[in-house]
Amino acid sequence: MARFLPISLSPIRRHSPPWSRQHLLLRPAPEPLFAPVVVEPTPLSANNPRIASLRRLSGRRKARLEAGRFVIEGPVPIAELLAAGADLDELYVDLDQWAQVDDRSPLRSVVRDADAAGVPVWGLTASVFASVSDTNSPQGALALALRTVTPISDVAQIDGPVLVLVDISDPGNAGTLVRAAEAAGCAGVVFVGSSTDPFGPKAVRAAAGSIVRLPIAEGSEVSPALDELRSSGRSLVATVVDGGVAPEATDLSGSVAILIGSEAHGLSAEVIATCSATITIPMQSAVESINAAVAGAVVLFEAARQRRNA
């Protein structure tokens, strides 16, 4: 009969020897299977004609209108425009910032995305980049995009409320209202009168991708623009500081155009007289009024609530 000798099992070590732990700690991280493609911006000299053109487009509304282009700054807003399908002509990068960031940074990422979309990528020195930037603390990326405006008659035919900005002068408010309008499901935003340029640098920063996803219309004259909206079957609703009805007590579920006036003076008496309803946001305490962008957002989201519940 066969005999089987017992096998001696060594106890399992709970701790590796010190040399083994040190060896493991010093092991280099494994290389990624697919390293990101390295895209290097093409340097431009300070005398390149593109630089002077960028300065004009960044600083002058007339130049943007003539060129049909606008400027957007910052890697994150530019990435949002790319994702929204915006037509970017060129991308400019601060070479100093470029050299200081790694492949996971938003700056490197947006350059890769732009290059993949066939957008030329140019590099500028820090001083030249600062001279074309509209911000005090440039974020290292600036792009040139197509300025697309939709006719008021086309915006009027789209389902959803239309936001009409009359003589809105602050670009930050304008951009914030564009973004709020998209979030609230508006058909589009119409800028009339002496309103700021919706494609100015500050307005674009506030609106981000909404500036290309949402139809934007412009009209220099207020009355013809309102007539166009009214003839399409839309009811005009004015927001006023006092004397109006609370937003929740006003029917905003149908085909409406909501008017917001200038930060300093609101809507004129003539414009208010052409509207079929007026809205006043109830406020407590001694506060007389709130920011135009805040007021607009309150009314827009009340309209969205009513449409959901209709």
Per-region residue spans from a language model:
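N-terminal positively charged helical leader segments and presequences
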Residues: 12-14, 19, 24-134
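Glycine- and other small-residue-rich loops at beta-strand/loop junctions that grip anionic moieties
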Residues: 43, 70, 166-167, 190-193, ...
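Short, ordered loop/turn segments at secondary-structure junctions
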Residues: 96, 193-196, 264
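Active-site/ligand-binding-proximal alpha/beta "capping" segment
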Residues: 237-287
